[in-house]
Amino acid sequence: MSSAIVVSQDAESLGLQIYSRKEKSLGVLVSNFLRLYNRDDVDLIGLDDAAGQLGVERRRIYDVVNILESIGIVARRGKNQYSWKGFGEIPRSLDELKEEGMRERLGYSSSNNSDKVSNGCEREEPLTLTPDDQENSSSSKMDQKKEKSLWLLAQNFVKMFLCSDDDLITLDSAAKALLSDSPDSVHMRTKVRRLYDIANVFASMNLIEKTHIPVTRKPAYRWLGSKSIAERGLSLFNSGEPKRVFGTEITNLRAKRNKTYCSSIRKQIGYKKHDEENTEQESKPAASKYVFGPFSPIGASKTNNDKVGKGRLLEIEALASTYQPQYCNQEITGLLGHFTEAWKKWYAEVDRNK
DNA sequence: CCCTCCCGCCAATGC
DNA sequence: GCATTGGCGGGAGGG
């Protein structure tokens, strides 16, 4: 009778709604999004559908897909429509980004171009490209808008990790580096605001991890393509846990932020802060349960037809083996291995539980 | 108090 | 014209 869950349920049954900022975070949204669409039978993603399924405003879906697209997990297919590419695309994307980033860093071979931070178009140009010869690449001002897009910002953010030699990056430093213009003032703040969103998303996928700079306690992020630490994830399946399981409610129909109401109410009700939360260093010494994000492959949730899940797994494994030899890229292969490992472990666990 | 960042207004852009 | 996209920053939540 003291668990946060119980309390919140009571509150709900009383007709009261609880607002929790955390449950509304982009990170959680993305987790749900991925859990929802990481299936074998998923190909197209409708924006309206997504918004409905996840119980959020349309606007938020744009944030999600824009960021995910920067890593190649989804791709724009058309109006109101994205297609699911899957985690298998990540290595490729990262590889490209790295190469691109390196080139920009010390590649003065080509003629053109300011030293603005990239703009190397990646995004599928609308098929109606002008019969413009030359490898070229734009130039005009048309893409000054694009320069501020979340999509590009996200790409440049990961480029920083992939190319830079220091593995701890502060949002401020990132913002500064990715600003290229107007060194100070409001632009910084805005940029940082955006970076918070991006960082949260990547963090929720365990692509990066939030830490602190050694001596200064300034928060910073570290890239962990592969060596992601084990923790949680399987907890999704351990039934009857007092823990607040991570996305038990795909449909996020929680109260709105509503000015001035809820916070006080919540306190009166006796809302206790989530116990659990950061299981940071759960003492799980040797148990190397790799987890890619707080979500798990859905195909297997209804085990018995391991066709579904296996298909995905094999697909990844195949990719891993074909991909490894050609590119000797630590980051990438590590990442893939990590994925494969995660899936294997997960399926094993499910089978046992069954 | 400062840091984090959700929310949704409304401007571009597309059709 | 309306519909889609998505910058942008006010100001609420959380430490």
UniProtKB/Swiss-Prot annotation:
GO cellular component, one term: transcription regulator complex
Cell compartments where the protein resides: Nucleus; Cytoplasm
Biased composition (Polar residues): 108-117
A GO BP entry: regulation of transcription by RNA polymerase II
SUPFAM superfamilies: Winged helix' DNA-binding domain
DNA-binding region range list: 21-86, 145-225
Region (Disordered): 104-143
UniProt GO molecular function: DNA binding; DNA-binding transcription factor activity; RNA polymerase II cis-regulatory region sequence-specific DNA binding
Pfam families the UniProt entry points to: E2F_TDP (PF02319)
Its biological purpose: Inhibitor of E2F-dependent activation of gene expression. Binds specifically the E2 recognition site without interacting with DP proteins and prevents transcription activation by E2F/DP heterodimers. Does not bind retinoblastoma-related proteins. Acts as a growth regulator but is not associated with changes in the expression of cell cycle marker genes or in nuclear ploidy levels. Has no effect on cell proliferation, but may repress cell wall biosynthesis genes during cell elongation in differentiated cells.
Protein name: E2F transcription factor-like E2FF
Organism whose genome encodes this protein: Arabidopsis thaliana (Mouse-ear cress)
Lineage of the species this protein comes from: Eukaryota, Viridiplantae, Streptophyta, Embryophyta, Tracheophyta
